[in-house]
């Protein structure tokens, strides 16, 4: 029989995704067939699953940790925010429509069937399924029709382990408070809790464990230290971008404007892992640095709205100065679209303006269309004559004179555009920098030798290190029950 456990957080960004990935790798290392599952995710960092269709990037990573092919059923409902109040709704890998907050609350109950169908698919043949919740079950205002936390756990009869983040402070109050406000049926699903991101002498929290036990009756299944290896894993949520920014006199500074609806910013992770590269994620209200050698404009869930914001920040003027200083620019997906002379949305797919003037660094134009391209791709860099692997997730078609200098071939067809002087290029291919040979060639073009280490191997090693750490610190009896 398949064993099942669900990690739910006392809040967002408590580290659930990393813990699920670590537990998946730990179980796999013990010879178990283990699979991850997240009923509902909200993220613009999407991946293309091995069976086609979109899932959250975290579930793709968790499948990698579990050493199993990724599937759209591992994340049956994916919400991709397009505006401050609305999201694109992806169900079992395919776009099902768009919904604003209240509309989605009404829609949720109808999605439970798809969620349960996917859960059955994932569970089939697995020894263990590790489920990740979303946000917190303490948000009882969202409990009606819930499919992400306790609504799913009670329906699927999956025991819950709460995760509290001690690094942000108030972890005892968050655990006890969650116990206090959960309805009785939900509270009974909780079997215990984990403390995450602890720094220092773990015995200093012994009294804390006793206090939580006194108020809730819940046992502690482990105090997990701050996992340094997690810094080598792709991040899923834009709330962590400040922590990803590096700085300090490296050979190459790469500036990345943080767009309001930034998508797939984990494209930059392989560059950030390079010892001679500084990645600077530039928040709104801050100019693009004048000492950057390369500016990367990342993907966007709403290209036209983000291009409006780009100008509002004055980043277009910063970009012009960067070009006059001899700098280089790469645009990926939505960032590529922005680099052209015009972006048109005649059908109103993005829900805002129908047309906007582009940044004018490439002689191309983009027109949005309802057909969405979602696929894993094998590609070739014409620029550096090396093989690439990546994926495409985009709406729209880009055409123009600079497309004649396409920097990439995807499955044998030209993709992207490059300026005549070679300093500006754009492509729809995500994962470009994750190809070691391409990254090495790019760094050499900036005078950096020795780059392009095996990024995938580094991620895999980080997962093993996290699994080993968890095996050391987690309660042995609980872990034994989990692993069988």
From Swiss-Prot:
Transmembrane segments: none annotated. Pathway: Cofactor biosynthesis; adenosylcobalamin biosynthesis. Residues 251-438 form the GATase cobBQ-type domain. It comes from the Bacteria. The active site is at 333 (nucleophile), 430. One of its GO terms (biological process) is cobalamin biosynthetic process. GO terms for molecular function: ABC-type vitamin B12 transporter activity; catalytic activity. InterPro entries: Class_I_gatase-like, CobQ/CobB/MinD/ParA_Nub-bd_dom, CobQ_GATase1, CobQ_N, CobQ_synth, GATase_3, P-loop_NTPase. The keyword Glycosyltransferase does not apply. Keywords: Cobalamin biosynthesis, Glutamine amidotransferase. Catalyzes amidations at positions B, D, E, and G on adenosylcobyrinic A,C-diamide. NH(2) groups are provided by glutamine, and one molecule of ATP is hydrogenolyzed for each amidation. Belongs to the CobB/CobQ family. CobQ subfamily. This is Cobyric acid synthase. It comes from Rhizobium meliloti (strain 1021) (Ensifer meliloti).
């Amino acid at each position: 029989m398949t064993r099942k456990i669900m990690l739910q957080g006392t809040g967002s960004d408590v580290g659930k995704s990393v813990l699920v990935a670590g537990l998946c790798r730990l179980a796999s290392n013990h010879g178990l067939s283990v699979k991850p599952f997240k009923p509902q995710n909200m993220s613009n960092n999407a991946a293309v699953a091995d069976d086609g269709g979109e899932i959250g990037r975290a579930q793709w990573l968790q499948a990698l940790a579990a050493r199993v092919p990724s599937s759209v059923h591992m994340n049956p409902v994916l919400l991709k925010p397009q505006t401050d109040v609305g999201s694109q709704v992806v169900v079992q890998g395919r776009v099902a429509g768009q919904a604003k907050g209240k509309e989605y609350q009404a829609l949720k109950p109808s999605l439970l069937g798809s969620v349960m169908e996917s859960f059955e698919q994932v569970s089939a043949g697995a020894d263990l399924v590790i489920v990740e919740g979303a946000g917190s079950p303490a948000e009882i205002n969202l409990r009606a029709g819930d499919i992400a936390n306790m609504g799913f756990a009670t329906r699927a009869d999956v025991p819950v382990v709460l995760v509290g983040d001690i690094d942000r402070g108030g972890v005892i109050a968050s655990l006890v408070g969650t116990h206090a406000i959960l309805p009785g049926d939900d509270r009974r699903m909780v079997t215990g809790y984990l403390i995450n991101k602890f720094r220092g002498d773990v015995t200093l929290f012994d009294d804390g464990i006793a206090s939580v036990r006194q108020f809730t009756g819940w046992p502690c299944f482990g105090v997990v230290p701050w996992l340094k290896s997690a810094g080598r894993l792709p991040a899923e949520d834009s709330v962590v971008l400040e922590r990803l920014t590096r700085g300090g006199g490296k050979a190459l500074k790469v500036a990345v404007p943080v767009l309001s609806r930034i998508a797939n910013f984990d494209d930059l992770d392989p560059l950030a892992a390079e010892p001679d590269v500084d990645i600077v994620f530039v928040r709104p209200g801050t100019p693009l640095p004048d000492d950057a050698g390369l500016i990367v404009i990342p993907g966007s869930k709403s290209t036209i709205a983000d291009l409006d914001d780009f100008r509002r920040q004055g980043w277009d003027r910063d970009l012009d100065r960067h070009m006059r200083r001899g700098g280089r620019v790469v645009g990926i997906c939505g960032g590529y679209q922005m680099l052209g002379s015009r972006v048109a949305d005649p059908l109103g797919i993005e829900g805002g303006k129908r047309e906007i003037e582009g940044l004018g660094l490439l002689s191309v134009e983009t027109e949005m269309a309802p057909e969405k391209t979602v696929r894993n791709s094998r590609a070739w860099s014409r620029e550096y004559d090396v093989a690439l692997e990546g994926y495409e997730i985009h709406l729209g078609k880009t055409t123009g004179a600079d497309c004649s200098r396409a920097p990439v071939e995807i499955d044998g067809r030209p993709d992207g555009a490059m300026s005549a002087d070679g300093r500006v290029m754009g492509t729809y291919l995500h994962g470009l920098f994750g190809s070691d040979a391409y990254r090495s060639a790019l760094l050499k073009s900036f005078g950096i030798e020795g780059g392009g280490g095996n990024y995938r191997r580094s991620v895999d090693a980080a997962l093993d290190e996290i699994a080993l750490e968890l095996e050391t610190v987690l309660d042995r009896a609980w872990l034994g029950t989990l692993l069988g």
